């Protein structure tokens, strides 16, 4: 396979494809945020950061505004203590939050749901959100002037049929109304100084059940995870997610609800996510919302305990970021960067607290992100993803091989470029491979740069 790079051709900016969710911290030890800074991670989405049932301390509305009957205009009604430490640390390390206004998932809600009910007064809930924003952006209640841009209204209200949803016990229509009331109030208060959006869609897996109807391939890839997702796509839960999506934007149009960005989630493979991104963009254009920013702000294409810290995980993460750079999607946030025993926590070893190889896929992308301008690439195919960036005389390229075999590659890269290999045995280890001709093994990544 011959891959050609043109560092004189500028095709746009390198987008923030290497954001994360659940930033890495232990207790209130935020020193692990240094890893985010080293990788130039651009955003940390604040959802599920509070621990089980919100943990009682961080971010969630019930953790900040503990008594819903209290006066929402009184600073004494708010408990910003722990959330202040978290948000301040993120800002200190140069990683602003995407602030989710809502609650943490309640995984065992079938026993009892605590905070995932619709607020009993949507207008008051919107005013509570207003004062949280004023605290972090306007200094209200001994607050800050952080200029946080992205404010997301709730998370995955579509995640399950009524009675089964771990995020939202209300009806679809109740969420639409909550979004409408809150978005209108926040935009009235803050105008263009903030961006308001949602609804953090749980996913679009079911479109592959009717490929002709939705304009997608019957099967974009065939790895084990994609096969599992195809089975999941047949479930009533997955079908409800799609119905919710169409109904949400129909409501937005009918009610003139303001929305600056649409957020969605996926745990599918790279090839499927590429197709989903195109589907989302087509739908938004059809709805009359083609101008919206879009965020894939919860994704993980190796969410299994046996895949954490493997070459498969790091290569697929790098491939996802390279692939989505070439889609319309504006921001990606990987789920997640926590330090803990979770199948989703793919960046850090929960025993040693050290980075897994997958973290270095984000660090490698960060090298291109710092350069700023995307450069021309041609010739990558068949499960090999390539991306390039340039800044004046500085050049860098990233290649990920997630195909079913080793890739024999030739390029027009100068032999003077240094190569750094990434897999579960090499954490961006410098290699003596000739950049003009080399073999990139299955599930390997290489970063090449001249600086």
Can you name each region flagged by the protein language model?
Residues 297-369, 373-385:
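Aromatic/acidic polysaccharide-binding cleft in carbohydrate-active enzymes
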Residues 380-415, 422-425, 443-444:
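Carbohydrate-binding surface patches
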Residues 20, 90, 132, 151, ...:
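Conserved, mostly hydrophobic/aromatic
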């Amino acid at each position: 396979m011959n891959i050609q790079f043109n560092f004189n051709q500028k095709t746009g900016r390198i987008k923030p494809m290497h954001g994360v969710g659940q930033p890495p911290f232990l207790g209130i030890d935020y020193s692990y945020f240094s890893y985010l800074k080293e990788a130039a991670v651009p955003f940390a989405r604040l959802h599920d950061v509070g621990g089980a049932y919100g943990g009682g301390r961080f971010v969630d509305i019930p953790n900040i505004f503990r008594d819903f009957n209290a006066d929402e205009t009184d600073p004494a009604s708010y408990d910003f203590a722990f959330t202040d430490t978290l948000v301040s640390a993120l800002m200190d390390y140069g990683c602003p939050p995407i602030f989710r206004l809502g609650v943490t998932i309640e995984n065992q809600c079938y026993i009892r749901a605590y905070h995932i009910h619709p607020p009993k007064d949507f207008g008051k809930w919107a005013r509570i959100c207003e004062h949280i924003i004023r605290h972090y952006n306007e200094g209200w209640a001994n607050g800050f002037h952080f200029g946080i841009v992205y404010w997301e209204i709730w998370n995955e209200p579509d995640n399950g049929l009524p009675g089964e949803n771990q995020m939202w016990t209300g009806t679809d229509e109740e969420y639409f109304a909550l979004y409408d009331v809150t978005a209108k109030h926040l935009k009235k208060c803050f105008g263009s100084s903030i961006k308001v959006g949602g609804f953090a869609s749980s996913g679009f897996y079911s479109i592959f059940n009717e490929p002709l109807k939705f304009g997608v391939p019957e099967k974009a890839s065939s790895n084990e995870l994609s096969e599992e997702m195809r089975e999941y796509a047949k479930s009533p839960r997955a079908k409800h997610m799609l119905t919710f999506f169409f109904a949400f934007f129909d409501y937005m149009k009918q009610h003139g609800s303001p929305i600056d960005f649409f957020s969605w989630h996926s745990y599918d493979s790279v090839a499927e996510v590429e197709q989903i991104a195109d589907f989302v963009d087509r739908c938004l254009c059809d709805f009359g919302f083609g101008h919206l920013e879009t965020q894939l702000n919860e994704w993980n294409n190796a969410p299994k305990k046996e895949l954490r810290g493997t070459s498969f995980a790091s290569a697929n993460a790098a491939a996802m970021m390279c692939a989505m750079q070439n889609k319309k999607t504006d921001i990606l946030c990987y789920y997640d960067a926590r330090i803990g025993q979770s199948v989703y926590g793919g960046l850090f070893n929960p025993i040693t607290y050290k980075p897994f190889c997958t973290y270095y896929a984000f660090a490698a992308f960060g090298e291109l992100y710092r350069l700023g301008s995307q450069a021309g690439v041609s010739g990558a195919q068949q499960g090999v993803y390539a991306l390039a960036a340039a800044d004046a005389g500085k050049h860098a390229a990233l290649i990920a091989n997630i195909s079913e075999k080793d890739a024999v590659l030739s390029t027009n890269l100068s032999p003077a470029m240094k190569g750094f290999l990434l897999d579960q045995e090499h954490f961006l280890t410098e290699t003596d491979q000739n950049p003009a001709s080399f073999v990139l093994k299955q599930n390997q990544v290489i970063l090449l740069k001249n600086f």
